[in-house]
């Protein structure tokens, strides 16, 4: 939300100036705000709400689609509005087990997509579970292989090119062979490196002011529910964030 606090418009404008392929935001309202602020880049909505389909149509916001229920609702909404070939992004669940079509559902999904003209698949993607940890390497490779097979099945059902992407910040660095057509750089955009090899450099600074300083003796508590117990005499500063 709000580009990790760095400012949605400011980050979006910078990325747009550098000609990124896509921006991604959580909900449709965020995307609409970027459009109103003058951002013209393609925008993916990662958590699309059924009640926000009209907003997506009006502001050219492209939803992630992760279930048959969501797909059917989107098709119906598009047909009501007279919308055709509306760009969507298919999510495949390769192991995160939060949202996404099961790989076994892809043949059925292809058949359903072929029978309608309201939506057109722009990309297919998945999320890596533990690409930042060596202990999960075997599972990460399994996810990549599963995604490659499922996305190939999806692509074979259509003549137009469907963009594929699975790598997050850690995946970009550790699995260059899995970068496919596009990657999703998240926290790494701000220089936060999931490893200690210093390939990324921190580009942000958080500054604030001190509102008040208290001299508090040992054995007193700080904060709600008295959870912060002081083991020594302390100087406590309150700061606004």
Predicted regions and their residues:
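Anionic-ligand-binding alpha/beta catalytic cores of soluble enzymes and soluble regulatory domains
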Residues: 137-235
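Short beta-strand micro-motifs in enzyme catalytic cores
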Residues: 86, 235-237
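A structural micro-motif recognizing beta-strand termini
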Residues: 239-241
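Active-site-proximal beta-alpha core segment in soluble small-molecule metabolic enzymes
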Residues: 1-165, 179
């Amino acid at each position: 939300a709000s580009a990790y606090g760095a400012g949605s418009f400011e980050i979006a404008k910078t990325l747009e100036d550098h000609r990124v392929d896509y921006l991604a935001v959580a909900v449709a309202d965020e995307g609409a705000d970027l459009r109103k602020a003058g951002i013209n880049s393609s925008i993916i909505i990662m958590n699309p709400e059924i009640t926000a389909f009209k907003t997506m149509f009006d502001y050219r916001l492209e939803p992630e689609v992760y279930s048959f229920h969501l797909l059917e609702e989107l098709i119906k909404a598009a047909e009501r509005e007279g919308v055709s070939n509306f760009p969507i992004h298919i999510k495949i669940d390769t192991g995160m087990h939060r949202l996404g079509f099961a790989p076994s559902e892809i043949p059925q999904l292809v058949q359903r997509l072929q029978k309608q003209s309201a939506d057109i698949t722009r990309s297919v993607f998945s999320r890596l579970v533990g690409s930042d940890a060596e202990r999960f390497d075997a599972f990460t490779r399994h996810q990549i292989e599963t995604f490659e097979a499922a996305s190939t099945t999806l692509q074979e059902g259509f003549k137009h090119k469907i963009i594929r992407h699975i790598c997050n910040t850690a995946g970009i660095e550790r699995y260059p062979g899995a970068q496919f057509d596009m990657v999703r750089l998240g926290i790494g955009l701000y220089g936060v490196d999931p490893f200690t090899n210093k390939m990324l450099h921190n580009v942000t600074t958080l500054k604030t002011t001190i509102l008040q300083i208290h001299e508090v003796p040992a054995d007193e508590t700080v904060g709600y529910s008295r959870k912060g117990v002081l083991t020594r005499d302390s100087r406590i500063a309150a700061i606004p964030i």
